[in-house]
């Protein structure tokens, strides 16, 4: 890490999260923007990264060449798409640098590819990079463990903006995994994603998901534990994308001196022992 701070690459630089990352890196001591990458053919390629993020010129031109961007970098922050993130994971592994992945909608097969890349890269991957959500996941696991499945039903409700393309959200699935871990069950077997028509009575021990989409909602998540005559709700509301950008930058700096491996935000925040 140089005297000006950890050299970070932002991929997906033209998107909402990419622009938020550029702004926050510019404001955060201990890190610096090394390069910014947008997809080939993007109208933003060749433009100044600071200008598109509302900072004014900062002297870093957006490129569509990740190989060149990763050269001499120390970390990459990635909120793109599953296929694109897997490509970047391979490049990060070749470069032996940190790769922070906030991309959602990844399949189990995608996860295996990330883990393979982590043999050479320090990969931090999470469905949500915020401190609050990761604390919520720990509390969800503890509550699921304490409240027995026969008497307490778990439902996970999430809402996001109308442009989000995957459902349930990565955060909802993260919370579902936490609930399943507390109950010592497999989420794939226990989850109920769709209810329509005559569904019959709710099966004890299942973990339900409900998805809402609309407007400009950044992210709202609630885990509901419903018992006879009482209900416990654990909720998180995101008011600004900067919470995810801030968490991703924190993760990159944390991973700088770590061994190659596959890490989560619980590791970054020192909460993994609570799993």
UniProtKB/Swiss-Prot annotation:
The active site annotation covers 160, 164
Q: Which UniProt keywords apply?
A: Amino-acid biosynthesis, Cytoplasm, Diaminopimelate biosynthesis, Lysine biosynthesis, NAD, NADP, Oxidoreductase
Q: Name the reaction it catalyses.
A: (S)-2,3,4,5-tetrahydrodipicolinate + NAD(+) + H2O = (2S,4S)-4-hydroxy-2,3,4,5-tetrahydrodipicolinate + NADH + H(+); (S)-2,3,4,5-tetrahydrodipicolinate + NADP(+) + H2O = (2S,4S)-4-hydroxy-2,3,4,5-tetrahydrodipicolinate + NADPH + H(+)
Q: What is its EC number?
A: 1.17.1.8
GO terms under biological process: diaminopimelate biosynthetic process; lysine biosynthetic process via diaminopimelate
Predominant location of this chain? cytoplasm
Q: Cite the binding residues for (S)-2,3,4,5-tetrahydrodipicolinate.
A: 161, 170-171
GO molecular-function terms, A-Z: 4-hydroxy-tetrahydrodipicolinate reductase; NAD binding; NADP binding; oxidoreductase activity, acting on CH or CH2 groups, NAD or NADP as acceptor
Top enzyme class, one word, equals oxidoreductase
Give the residues the record marks as binding NADP(+): 39
Which PROSITE patterns does the entry mention? DAPB (PS01298)
| SUPFAM superfamilies per record | Glyceraldehyde-3-phosphate dehydrogenase-like, C-terminal domain (SSF55347), NAD(P)-binding Rossmann-fold domains (SSF51735)
Chain's gene name: dapB
The entry's cellular-component GO terms read: cytoplasm
Q: Name the family the entry cites.
A: Belongs to the DapB family.
Protein name, as recorded: 4-hydroxy-tetrahydrodipicolinate reductase
Q: In which pathway does it act?
A: Amino-acid biosynthesis; L-lysine biosynthesis via DAP pathway; (S)-tetrahydrodipicolinate from L-aspartate: step 4/4
Keyword Heme belongs to the record: no
